[in-house]
Amino acid sequence: MTIAITIISSLLFLIVGLVVGSLIFKSSTEKKLAAARGTAELIVEDAKKEAETTKKEALLEAKEENHRLRTEIENELRGRRTETQKAENRLLQREENLDRKDTSLSKREATLERKEESISKRQQQIEEKESKLAEMIQAEQTELERISALSKEEAKSIILNQVEDELTHDTAIMVKETENRAKEESDKKAKNILSLAIQRCAADHVAETTVSVVTLPNDEMKGRIIGREGRNIRTLETLTGIDLIIDDTPEAVILSGFDPIRREIARIALEKLVQDGRIHPARIEEMVDKARKEVDEHIREVGEQATFEVGIHSIHPDLIKILGRLRYRTSYGQNVLNHSLEVSKLAGILAGELGEDVTLAKRAGLLHDIGKAIDHEIEGSHVEIGVELATKYKENDVVINSIASHHGDTEATSVIAVLVAAADALSAARPGARSETLENYIRRLEKLEEISESYDGVEKSYAIQAGREVRIIVEPDTIDDLSSYRLARDIRKRIEEELDYPGHIKVTVIRETRAVEYAK
């Protein structure tokens, strides 16, 4: 029974197990089917989506290909249109060129036609002239045939005249060649003589300056020289015409002026004032007068020394004094007295070499520039003034001619005059002997004073401040105060018209009236 129960139970369990197993299997199968259906649906859905995507991509590619093809076609069409347009433009340009060439050819044809007409006319004129020329030649031949009926003597005379002309020409050539050879030989001899003369004459030259320096014992003396409100320095500048420069230079005062004589007078007067110690306007006037007399005496001594140096005697005392003034005169920076002494010595040496009068040659050389001593005081060139002085003091005619001809203004009438001119050129042309800049500066200052002193009533004028100022001292009885202004204006106008100068020039007219009484 137990076994039966066990079997039944086992069968029941088996049946139940089979049923449960079948149910589980069925459920599992249904789930798998459902999962398979879901997977199939997903696959179908994905396939649809992929197909849709592929379709869209295909459409997009088709559109892009279509756009690309359209663009290529349009570009190709555009390029063809451009080429077509260019071809049309080239054709138009060719047509224009052809038109221009056609026009140019037409003009050339017209020009050629005109030239042909002109050539035809010229040819016609030439033929007419040739015809006239032939007629003239025929007429001349006829006339010559008529005239040629000469006698034997006439033909001989013509031949002799021709021979004479040829001989005269040949003789002139021979004479010219002889003259050239003589000139060459004379040039060689002259150079030899000049070289000997130069070797035997040597002179030192120092370039002149336009300033002098006065040494002071101490710097306090500068204030005394200036004076109260500058009256002392103004008085000294007015009396001498020299510009006093008082600056930071220790224990020194600089005197500036282009006239060496006035500068020397100012230097001596100032040195005497400094030595004396009493410096006031009255004392300054006294010292300037003494200095002027001292300089005049020194000028006379210098003139005598110059004549003694070259061995010249019996010169008029006044001419000796004028000669001494050359010590304070420069020409292009060369001291004129030293230059005259050098010319005198050179002329004497040259005269000795040529057998001429040595003493007379030295005399002419010494006095050849005598006019330069006073050419800034008298109208005329230094040559004209020198001739007048030599004539006035009864110098030899050879000396007078040497003065007149040493610059070629007058023809030399003697060998000595030629020698003086040569010696003058030797002395002046030596390198370093002269400086044109200083001479031009001095000439400008002299011209300033000359313009100022050309007016009536002007007593004296001084160019100072290196030519930047000209001071004119007038006669108070002749020029009143109003006339002083007018005079300054007139002088200013003449300076502007006649002079070339840098910067400005101050024109100062000084009118001073003095009333002097003596108490007894």
Swiss-Prot record:
Positions of the KH domain: 210-273
Record lineage: Bacteria, Bacillati, Bacillota, Bacilli, Bacillales
Family according to the record: Belongs to the RNase Y family.
GO molecular function, one term: RNA endonuclease activity
Annotated membrane topology: Single-pass membrane protein
CDD domains associated with the record: HDc (cd00077), KH-I_RNaseY (cd22431)
Stated name of the protein: Ribonuclease Y
Native organism: Listeria welshimeri serovar 6b (strain ATCC 35897 / DSM 20650 / CCUG 15529 / CIP 8149 / NCTC 11857 / SLCC 5334 / V8)
EC identifiers of the protein: 3.1.-.-
GO cellular component terms listed in the entry, alphabetical order: plasma membrane
Cited SMART domains: HDc (SM00471), KH (SM00322)
Role summary: Endoribonuclease that initiates mRNA decay.
Subcellular location: Cell membrane
TM region(s), chain numbering: 5-25
Keyword Lipid biosynthesis (UniProt): no
Key words, A-Z: Cell membrane, Endonuclease, Hydrolase, Membrane, Nuclease, RNA-binding, Transmembrane, Transmembrane helix
Occurrences of domain HD (ranges): 336-429
Region called Disordered, residue ranges: 70-127
Domain of life: Bacteria
Keyword Oxidoreductase tagged: no
Enzyme class: hydrolase
NCBIfam families xref list: HDIG, RNase_Y
GO biological process, one term: mRNA catabolic process
